[in-house]
């Protein structure tokens, strides 16, 4: 078990200490593996104070080290770096209830001007990520990517209604609104990666997939396979030579195409999916705390 000590530049008042004691078991990211840090390296405030873009903060958060607040000792916090496979009590900082078996990830705050501040000391405040189920994190990423792509070639007044609908997400009876999109360098990189990947999939996948679908339908007459075969037959012209004996070079070329398509699919997944940090084992009655296994 690795311990990190965070010392505050300002002297903590009794009120500050009381506030921090209520935040036990909260997940706090730090920039890198260090045994001793200052409050300036604690949480997301150094990032969100200079850049409000959700995608930018999310990309930085993905590179940060996870710690869990264990206790307050005088003017410092004691944080624990979780160990893979071990159980920890984790505080629910997100808006969504957790359920047993949930896989949890970290996302940036959805609002940069939350009415409820965890702790504010001078010009610094404690800003932590939301711990949410991976399913809703992926849905948020997908919608933000869709909005960004649509916004590239359309005027805002053309798509205002659609964007308003996409920005509202209801999950487990909780309604949230997505942050505004900023088409900066980070967002443009995501959109460029998505477009390149989709272009390569569109170019290479139909022919090789139709070959495999045609062979599979000979063995399996499921309606879904047949419908896929009908769909592909309208879009592709089957190369009859592929149905015969393939030479070694042709097999190698085919394998390269399959690997390329799967790699591009993985690229898109990396834009939308978040890694799992915790798996929920048990949830408290008020759903504000859970026993979780650390998986990262």
Swiss-Prot record:
Q: Which GO terms describe its cellular component?
A: host cell nucleus; viral capsid
Query: Where does the protein principally reside?
Result: virion
Q: Which Pfam families match?
A: Herpes_V23
Q: Which UniProt keywords apply?
A: Capsid protein, Host nucleus, Virion
Q: Which GO terms describe its molecular function?
A: structural molecule activity
Domain of life (superkingdom)? Viruses
InterPro entries given for it?
Answer: Herpes_capsid_2 (IPR002690)
Localisation per UniProt entry? Virion; Host nucleus
**Subunit text:** Interacts with TRX1 and major capisd protein/MCP.
Similarity-based family: Belongs to the herpesviridae TRX2 protein family.
The protein's role, per its UniProt record: Structural component of the T=16 icosahedral capsid. The capsid is composed of pentamers and hexamers of major capsid protein/MCP, which are linked together by heterotrimers called triplexes. These triplexes are formed by a single molecule of triplex protein 1/TRX1 and two copies of triplex protein 2/TRX2. Additionally, TRX1 is required for efficient transport of TRX2 to the nucleus, which is the site of capsid assembly.
Q: What is this protein called?
A: Triplex capsid protein 2
Q: What is the lineage of its organism?
A: Viruses, Duplodnaviria, Heunggongvirae, Peploviricota, Herviviricetes
